[in-house]
UniProtKB/Swiss-Prot annotation:
Source organism: Salmonella schwarzengrund (strain CVM19633)
Enzyme type, top EC level: transferase
One GO CC term on file: membrane
Name under which the protein is recorded: UDP-4-amino-4-deoxy-L-arabinose--oxoglutarate aminotransferase
Keywords, comma-separated and alphabetical: Aminotransferase, Antibiotic resistance, Lipid A biosynthesis, Lipid biosynthesis, Lipid metabolism, Lipopolysaccharide biosynthesis, Pyridoxal phosphate, Transferase
Summary of subunit composition and partner proteins: Homodimer.
Amino acid sequence: MSDFLPFSRPAMGAEELAAVKTVLDSGWITTGPKNQELEAEFCRLTGNQYAVAVSSATAGMHIALMALGIGEGDEVITPSMTWVSTLNMIVLLGANPVMVDVDRDTLMVTPEHIEAAITPQTKAIIPVHYAGAPADLDAIYALGERYGIPVIEDAAHATGTSYKGRHIGARGTAIFSFHAIKNITCAEGGIVVTDNPQFADKLRSLKFHGLGVDAWDRQSGGRAPQAEVLAPGYKYNLPDLNAAIALAQLQKLDALNARRAAIAAQYHQAMADLPFQPLSLPAWEHIHAWHLFIIRVDETRCGITRDALMASLKTKGIGTGLHFRAAHTQKYYRERFPTLTLPDTEWNSERICSLPLFPDMTESDFDRVITALHQIAGQ
């Protein structure tokens, strides 16, 4: 229908169009100077020394795990309440994903669950900053240091998120997403931040065929026209067309996230009169990026299932999302780990629903969602 309200919509404007035109007019549209500019600006945001732009956050996770040497027989701890790409990358490297439970009310992986899963084979811990809020990094990094295990932060939801006064990523290595529904987007893309120069060099090589330089380096840096493969790599570089859009979005991040926060505050106020349960906020000091606004739809409390609610909202022209169906309940992982039970993850996986939330959402759009929820709840 023409008046369908999507669950998310990218906030694009004249700045993004101008940025794309500049790149097209330059004659250099693949990885080049806009990538370098994006990496520098993102380091200013997070406080890291190095950033490596990639074609997606999934690509970033893949090469980050490779750069750590993750392989056959290794174990990587991650929540099941995450997008399946993390699990897929672990498996495709021959390693074993060790999925752990989350806090029932925040959906954050807990240090207690992480520590209980550590074995001599554990080679990485991947906490997820869920929905725009931060995980408890002090406790998680303390575990990593105690056991000598690297931490890779899944920050796909966390552009603009801070933990105890520092932007996510500032503690070590984190992977951000520029996917179409994220707080800033360039359609598809991602970026990895780190303070380790050797790790950053490995990422740069792995993202571009295993070469020591990319096409722009060879064109502009006076390097030999034929670079040498240092180790087999992938084609995960980000075109400058995408980087230019991401740069334009990054310049608007504060305003975009402020609008998201305002809508989230309205949702919280409205939920006081509705049976649907929002996620709880983390107890530690933080700034929430409000990537998602999630409610839990418990049939006993609400008189309707989550799936029925989503279907009903769809008939009213309102889109919703599911973030996420727990990874261990999906076919491949269900069959690979048939005895795995994660009670709080499973309870939420059956009940969570993401409501529309995006910067260009109007007051009329918001009222429409709340009116529909009241109608469905029989109020």
